[in-house]
A protein has these predicted regions:
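A general structural signal for well-ordered alpha-helical segments in protein cores
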Residues: 19, 79, 88-91, 127, ...
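A structural preference for short, pocket-lining loop segments at secondary-structure junctions
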Residues: 1-7, 24-35, 54, 58-62, ...
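CoA-thioester-processing core
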Residues: 21-26, 36, 42-95, 129-130
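Glycine-rich phosphate-binding loop at the start of an alpha helix
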Residues: 13-20, 43, 76, 100, ...
Length: 198
């Protein structure tokens, strides 16, 4: 019994540490982060995208944060970053309702900078178009040091608040795991008792 408890405790400790570390790495990253979103972004990955400085999406891309459907709470700083980037209405749809947010919806609210018109099987074309856009917009005509200094100034007011929000999310997730709620939701999905929107 004690050995199983130790394994569970270690698993939870790793969950907390890894979640805090990866989220912190994204919202404190000093360089310009560009995301080329050429398909679905789900869960923690979707949350972390919100910390990108520029996001380019394919028309078929979408965000899905099924935290509430799985008995979890928001993670990856999404409870703050989504509100900032999507606006409160779309953030509520994404986080509370576990609603899929399409590329067009993301463009309308300013979550993405541009939709690159390519098909689902045109990954190479999509990447080439994103790289061309980045080179055109962030190329040699701009001073690299100024870019990162301006980013630091833009992000400075939210850093301390994000530290607290990320800890609150991780502790909320830990409480849910300890109570067994997500495990029960995953069991229902595995047994066909519950359909999921993925």
């Amino acid at each position: 019994m004690a050995e199983g408890t130790d394994v569970r405790r270690e698993t939870l400790r790793n969950f907390v540490a890894n979640n805090l570390e990866i989220t912190n790495a994204f919202y404190t990253h000093p360089k310009i982060l560009v995301t080329a979103l050429n398909g679905p972004a789900v869960g923690l990955s979707a949350a972390l995208i919100a910390f990108s400085d520029f996001i380019y999406a394919a028309p078929h891309a979408f965000l899905l944060t099924p935290f509430t459907s799985l008995g979890l709470v928001a993670e990856g700083g999404a409870s703050k970053a989504f509100v900032q980037r999507l606006g409160i209405s779309k953030a509520n749809e994404a986080l509370i309702m576990s609603k899929r947010i399409t590329a067009q919806e993301m463009l309308q609210v300013g979550f993405v900078n541009k939709i690159i018109q390519t098909g689902k099987n045109e990954q190479e074309t999509f990447l080439a178009e994103v790289l061309k856009e980045v080179e055109d917009r962030l190329g040699n005509h701009l001073n690299n040091d100024s870019l990162v200094r301006v980013k630091a100034l833009i992000r400075k007011p939210e850093r301390e608040m994000m530290d607290g929000q990320t800890v609150a999310e991780v502790l909320g997730g830990l409480e849910r795991f300890v109570s067994g709620i997500p495990q029960e939701e995953f069991r229902k999905i595995a047994n066909g008792e519950k359909k999921h929107k993925l």
